[in-house]
């Protein structure tokens, strides 16, 4: 008898949990529909040349919990102004939602809409720029769609701005390599943040093309041999690592959590003098580590763990002993967070060596691969993969987006997407100012 009662209680609990989930989905669906109507209304006003305006009743669909204006206050003020009772259509949308539902709605919106919604109020701006929402937004994209990467290339626009061009995977390799800038380097892109530096300048820039935010870093003295960018997968801290040469080869790391440069040898010992990365290739960030091809030969690969900040070396695939890295035919890249090495001299139908890692060992596996434009990364040093995400955890130094120039069939302010695949039909250009002038050519 006792077992039957417990079973009945358990069934009732599951039934109510199911009803709660269905109710939550229905509320979210209605709110997202109202959001879509609101954004369509704003877009229509912008198209007609009008300044987009939204009533407080409309925005109350997802009013922030800290807002002081209640629904009753709104009705009272409206009655005082017009002497009329608010219509049913105006009061239908005036619904306050709890914090959880507000975040559930916002994290499902595209990045470009969230950027526009920051201008509604200080409360909205604070919520959208919070690390918590940015992290949830990123994880939801990864879970639902995977990080749909596109190709970007960075070029000098003026002495105080750079131009970021966005390309679809279907654009192929030639579109990326056609206008290569010999002095700009893009050592990496991680979670929607892009690292850029110049060979003839001391500055390093961190950009978020989706929000227009930039951060300028000035590393210690010395000639930059290579710059790497990635995230510590243990702590979630973004780090910029610089190999430099002055009177000897050294390494400095910038931690974006502490906002300080530190000499790496203080914690991990000096870097081997023979481990000089080749300037013809950018480092590759894979699963919390940076990988470099060495300039001396291709017998080893230099590896730095961004958590421990210690260096080690990795042996090359055995089948590639006869290939000279200085020839420029060896390319190292990341695919599905795995390190890949390929010989581009073999053409599009090439063998690719994939590094398979686990807790106890790591080994190379060779596979035949079709290196088409939608899979193979850009070859030029000023290009990289890029994921369109909200992540911009360091808003302390902001800059102004100068503008965007559209090409070909693009129809939106920044992006033109294929409705079926979600892919970009680009190329599209975005000009972002930097807080320090870029050195003229």
From Swiss-Prot:
Coiled-coil annotated residue ranges, if any: none
Lineage per the UniProt record: Eukaryota, Viridiplantae, Streptophyta, Embryophyta, Tracheophyta
InterPro entries for this protein: F-box-assoc_interact_dom, F-box-like_dom_sf, F-box_dom, SCF_F-box_component
Protein name per its UniProtKB record: Putative F-box protein At1g33530
PANTHER family xrefs: BNACNNG10540D PROTEIN, F-BOX PROTEIN CPR30-LIKE
Domain F-box, chain residue ranges per copy: 91-137
Pfam families: F-box (PF00646)
The organism of origin for this protein: Arabidopsis thaliana (Mouse-ear cress)
CDD domains recorded: F-box_AtFBW1-like
């Amino acid at each position: 008898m006792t077992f039957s009662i417990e079973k009945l209680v358990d069934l009732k609990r599951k039934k109510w949990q199911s009803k709660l989930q269905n109710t939550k989905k229905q509320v979210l669906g209605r709110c997202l529909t109202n959001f879509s109507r609101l954004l369509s209304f704003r877009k229509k006003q912008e198209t007609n040349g009008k300044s987009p305006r939204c009533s407080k009743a409309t925005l109350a669909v997802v009013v922030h919990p800290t807002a002081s204006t209640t629904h009753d206050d709104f009705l009272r003020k409206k009655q005082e102004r017009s002497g009329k009772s608010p219509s049913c259509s105006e009061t239908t949308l005036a619904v306050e939602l709890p914090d959880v539902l507000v975040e559930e709605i916002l994290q499902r919106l595209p990045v470009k809409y969230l950027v526009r919604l920051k201008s509604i109020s200080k409360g909205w701006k604070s919520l959208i720029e919070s690390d918590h929402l940015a992290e949830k937004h990123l994880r939801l994209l990864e879970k639902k769609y995977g990080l749909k990467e596109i190709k970007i290339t960075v070029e000098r626009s003026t002495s105080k701005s750079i131009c970021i061009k966005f390309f679809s995977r279907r654009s192929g390799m030639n579109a990326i390599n056609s206008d290569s800038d010999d002095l700009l380097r893009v050592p990496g892109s991680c979670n929607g943040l892009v690292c850029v530096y110049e060979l003839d300048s001391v500055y390093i820039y961190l950009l978020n093309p989706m929000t227009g935010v930039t951060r300028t870093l000035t590393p210690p003295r010395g000639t930059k041999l290579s710059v790497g960018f990635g995230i510590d997968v243990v702590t979630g801290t973004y780090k910029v690592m610089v190999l430099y040469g002055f009177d000897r080869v050294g390494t400095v790391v910038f931690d974006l959590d502490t906002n300080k440069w530190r000499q790496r040898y203080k914690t991990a010992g000096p870097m081997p003098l023979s481990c000089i990365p080749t300037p013809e290739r950018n480092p590759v960030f894979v699963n919390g580590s940076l990988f470099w091809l060495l300039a001396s030969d291709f017998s080893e690969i230099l590896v730095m763990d961004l958590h421990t900040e210690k260096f080690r070396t990795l042996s090359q695939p055995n089948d590639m002993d006869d290939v000279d890295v200085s020839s420029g035919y060896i390319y190292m890249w990341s695919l599905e967070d795995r390190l890949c090495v390929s010989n581009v001299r073999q053409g599009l139908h090439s063998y690719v060596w994939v590094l398979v890692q686990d807790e106890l060992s790591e080994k190379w596996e060779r596979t035949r691969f079709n290196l088409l434009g939608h899979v193979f990364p850009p070859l030029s040093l000023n290009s990289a993969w890029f994921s369109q995400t909200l992540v911009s955890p360091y808003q302390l130094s902001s800059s102004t987006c100068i503008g965007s120039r559209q090409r070909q069939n693009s129809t939106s302010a920044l992006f033109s997407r294929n409705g079926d695949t979600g892919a970009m039909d680009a190329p599209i250009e975005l000009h972002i100012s930097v807080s320090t002038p870029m050195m003229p050519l």
